């Protein structure tokens, strides 16, 4: 059996979208109830996906503006990014294309991205929207549209609180690294119209 491949997976996204909760939920099967900005240490574990053993290294980042200059230091050597937004925060959804995609393209061009909508349990929670009248839910269709717009191979909605699709997020991230999606070859207009006389 061959040695396991190391995969560095870095989570990014706005502050308070649930990046740390997602990581804690995945690594310990528990849900932290108090919000403390980025207290997750880097984590490494052997994971088997599609019969391949992978040493998965998880890196948490702080989404707050205060960390804009420090955060990119953790991008070096990343194999895949988990780009998270909250399904109950339109601002975090909009920042995927406004802030995060430009940052990732600048500091880590070509690294694949798994787009993740977090807090799935709250999207259908009527009481949450009564208590937070300004909150706007993001639909699955909107998430898929954003995935296409940013060119991410995968979009997954999950809930760290209920564990729904949490494992699927990290399995998808590993799969994207082990089996990158085939690039569609586009012929430029110049190639199509060129004729030699």
Curated annotation (Swiss-Prot):
A Gene Ontology term for the protein's cellular component: spindle
Binding site for GTP: 13-20, 60-64, 118-121
Protein family according to the UniProt entry: Belongs to the small GTPase superfamily. Rho family.
Subcellular location: Cytoplasm; Membrane
SMART domains assigned to the protein according to its UniProt record, in alphabetical order: RAB, RAS, RHO
Residues with a covalently attached lipid (S-geranylgeranyl cysteine): 194
CDD domains in the cross-refs: Rop_like (cd04133)
Primary localization class, coarse: cytoplasm
Superkingdom of the source species: Eukaryota
GO terms assigned for molecular function: GTP binding; GTPase activating protein binding; GTPase activity
Keywords in alphabetical order: Cytoplasm, GTP-binding, Hydrolase, Lipoprotein, Membrane, Methylation, Nucleotide-binding, Prenylation
Species of the source: Arabidopsis thaliana
Subunit organization: Part of a complex containing ROPGEF1 and PRK2. Interacts with UGT1, ICR1, ICR2, ICR3, ICR4 and ICR5. Interacts with PHIP1 when activated by GTP.
Protein name: Rac-like GTP-binding protein ARAC11
UniProt motif Effector region: location: 35-43
Example of a GO biological process term: small GTPase-mediated signal transduction
Tissue/organ expression: Exclusively expressed in mature pollen and pollen tubes.
Listed Pfam families: Ras
Residues modified as Cysteine methyl ester: 194
Function: May be involved in cell polarity control during the actin-dependent tip growth of pollen tubes. May regulate callose synthase 1 (CALS1) activity through the interaction with UGT1. Inactive GDP-bound Rho GTPases reside in the cytosol, are found in a complex with Rho GDP-dissociation inhibitors (Rho GDIs), and are released from the GDI protein in order to translocate to membranes upon activation.
Lipid bilayer topology: Peripheral membrane protein
Prosequence residues removed at maturation: 195-197
UniProt catalytic activity: GTP + H2O = GDP + phosphate + H(+)
Keyword GTP-binding: yes
Annotated EC: 3.6.5.-
InterPro entries: P-loop_NTPase, Small_GTP-bd, Small_GTPase, Small_GTPase_Rho
